[in-house]
Design a protein with these regions (language model features):
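Hydrophobic structural segments
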Residues: 1-163
């Protein structure tokens, strides 16, 4: 279910959290009803902003306590790629689709610094930080599909803390 949800819903949910406009699939894996489907989305942020302001915007919109930022804080970004969970495999697709920043989780140092050397900033919002919105989304869908069942959502609790 996890990967299926990543393809069918997670990307559009993350893009919606960030209010991306003019969206397209980041990494196509197939199609649904003749429409491209796949991992991640790429589109435009509501307005151009610095990388530092983008990082703060991501924290606020995704409701997470911290992000790791790779790139110059003053770099202006508008075109963003987002991929929930681990985004290491979509760096090339994000660059090919002219993303100025990739917002994802589980980004390792070497991949992130290589992306920056290639001209694209990276915001690592954490695997959990980019995917915990799944809980509420699936609960809402289940409430619609099986209204005769009580659906309880697990409490949101980040699995780690930073000292």
């Amino acid at each position: 279910m996890h990967t299926n949800y990543d393809v069918c819903r997670m990307a559009e949910l993350n893009a919606s959290q960030l209010n991306l406009s003019d969206q397209e699939v980041l990494f196509e894996t197939g199609e649904q009803n003749g429409i491209p489907a796949g991992i991640g989305r790429v589109g435009n942020l509501p307005e151009a902003m610095t990388l530092e302001d983008t990082a703060r915007y991501v924290k606020e919109r995704m409701g997470i306590p911290e992000v790791i930022v790779y790139g110059d804080a003053g770099t202006e970004v508008r075109r963003a790629a987002v991929s929930g969970g681990s985004g290491r495999s979509v760096v090339g697709s994000a660059a090919a689709k002219k993303a100025q920043v990739l917002i994802t989780g589980d980004m390792d140092y070497h991949t992130a610094t290589d992306a920056v050397a290639g001209g694209m900033c990276v915001i690592d919002a954490g695997h959990y930080g980019t995917e915990y919105c799944f809980i509420r989304d699936v609960a809402e869908q289940l409430r619609k599909e099986v209204p005769f069942c009580e659906i309880r959502e697990a409490a949101v609790r980040h699995p780690y803390y930073v000292i």
